[in-house]
Amino acid sequence: MHMNFNNKSEILKRANFLLKDGIKNRDSLFHTPIISSLNGNEISSRVMVLRDHIASKRVIRFHSDYRSDKVHELKANKKISVIGYDPNLKTQIRLTGKAKINHKNKSSKKAWEESQAISKKCYSVKDGSSTKTNKPELYDFHMKDISVEDGYKNFCTIEIYYDTLEFLYLQRQGHRRCKFKWNAKGKLQSFWLVP
């Protein structure tokens, strides 16, 4: 795909395309970006699977166990950062914004119903993510006593409403870095940054 990396509107379209593609394309490195939140004064990062992107609302969605550390962190501080990089495309996308946790509501129910059974099993285990254990085999998915639908009570979605999107493209003749920033009313400002 040939595009003009000197055109900010084309860059924003490209970023939206790569994020949308990352939802279903498991080979895309934007399918599994790094999500960072704050745990007190410490940065806490993890790789998560991108489940949805709605460019018009500037929202991306991930799934999580409601009992996890990241959910507790985001309840205490909604600030969040997302970064993905694909070395083949020489492209980095970074988002910053605020997280919203959906648990036992219409949004989480819809996402749960659209999830595959293998994904649901992750939320059906006895203890939440990051719980210490001496017997990891107790959490293997081949267990016969897991009731998959019981996992819904532990399932939540994390929606990230981003107010900045930064796009970096690496090229031999000169890199391009552009930042898009939306104010509280949704008005877009964009500017070039030195890479």
Residue map of PLM features:
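An N-terminal domain-cap segment
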Residues: 2-57, 61, 72
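Short acidic, glycine-rich loop/turn motifs
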Residues: 37-40, 84-88, 169-171, 182-184
